[in-house]
Amino acid sequence: MIKILGIESSCDDTAVSIITENREILSNIIISQNTEHAVFGGVVPEIAARSHLSNLDKALKNVLKESNTKLTEISAIAATSGPGLIGGVIVGSMFARSLSSAFKKPFIAINHLEGHALTARLTDNIPYPYLLLLASGGHCQFVAVLGLGKYKILGSTIDDAIGEAFDKVAKMLNLAFPGGPEIEKRAKLGDPHKYKFPKPIINSGNCNMSFSGLKTAVRTLIMSLKELNDAVINDIAASFQFTIGEILSSKVQDAIIAYERVVNDYYENIDYTTQLNLKSFRQDEFKEEPAEHTKVREHRLYPQNSLGSSFLNDAIVIAGGVAANKYLQEILSNCAKTYGYQLIYPPIRLCTDNAAMIAYAGLERYNNKLFTPLNFCPKARWSLEDISK
């Protein structure tokens, strides 16, 4: 049986996981560093890297024990090798490469964003292509996921990442770290229409987003208030979260149009034999019947010929830590339905940083014999579009 060991250390969570060729997660250990960073109100890179050093060995031992697996039984070792806080990325990558060298197992360098991008294939049996909204503490972008290593960024934030905005607003409101869950919790108790915040570049006509102006508006409001009591905090949290939902919803239609255009162009530019092989692959890729939401739909926003319709799915995937926000899940789900799509999101435990997604990305690359030399240099910045370069 094929077993892939995954290692994740790109930010403040130390994670190790083992999955099988059947996409079964045998073990998925995450050691959080929230306590170490809470006093600073954010992640301190030096502390994070040192914690990874002490946590990785412990996490590996726990995963091997829980999965009843020996290192000699591992087929390949996949590790996040960028993008992220470079100290932590180096620690995890070196740990993985040391194991690879010692046990003579293939090493697979994984782009952290690709891990998030492919999580829906691990959990929801989604074939390529699909539209992805990657929303996390470090990124916010719409991506056309065309195939393994084939990604087209349709639009992204031009300033702050969406998760960063959540964390910084939470800090302004004196809420605990990490801020995203705290904002969501407080928002349930507040009035989302109490304060009207700006929605930057909402009518730009493209898929780019901006959250810096929204964050500044919240800070300006807080500074103007005489008192920041619980009721006010709840209302600000609710109004902020509501505005985020409005921004994302307004961009979904732009993203769908761009996605459908990209899919159409992509398949028009490949030869006919490859088209037939891809159609066959999409039918036979998984042993079980594809989920209902992965089947081809006829309606689309972007008028195109019949070629693209053979490949176009009706799934919008949201991944990354912000995907765990249930309010945004509901808002975006309703928005997707308006345009004939269905929103797919991983279970909460796989929304935030984890090693199961890294192991799964490793599995796809293992199956395609895409291995990485041990002298690979970890990267602090690594775009999805540059993976195959």
UniProtKB/Swiss-Prot annotation:
One of its GO terms (molecular function) is iron ion binding. Its cofactor is Fe(2+). It catalyses: L-threonylcarbamoyladenylate + adenosine(37) in tRNA = N(6)-L-threonylcarbamoyladenosine(37) in tRNA + AMP + H(+). It is an enzyme of class 2 (transferase). It is found in: Cytoplasm. Fe cation binds at H112, H116, D353. It holds the Pfam family TsaD. GO terms for biological process: tRNA threonylcarbamoyladenosine modification. Substrate binds at L134, A135, S136, G137, G138, D167, G180, N325. The keyword Zinc does not apply. Its main location: cytoplasm. Binds 1 Fe(2+) ion per subunit. Its EC number is 2.3.1.234. Belongs to the KAE1 / TsaD family. Required for the formation of a threonylcarbamoyl group on adenosine at position 37 (t(6)A37) in tRNAs that read codons beginning with adenine. Is involved in the transfer of the threonylcarbamoyl moiety of threonylcarbamoyl-AMP (TC-AMP) to the N6 group of A37, together with TsaE and TsaB. TsaD likely plays a direct catalytic role in this reaction. NCBIfam families: gcp_kae1, RPE3, T6A_TsaD_YgjD. PANTHER family: TRNA N6-ADENOSINE THREONYLCARBAMOYLTRANSFERASE (PTHR11735), TRNA N6-ADENOSINE THREONYLCARBAMOYLTRANSFERASE, MITOCHONDRIAL (PTHR11735:SF6). This is tRNA N6-adenosine threonylcarbamoyltransferase. It comes from Rickettsia felis (strain ATCC VR-1525 / URRWXCal2) (Rickettsia azadi).
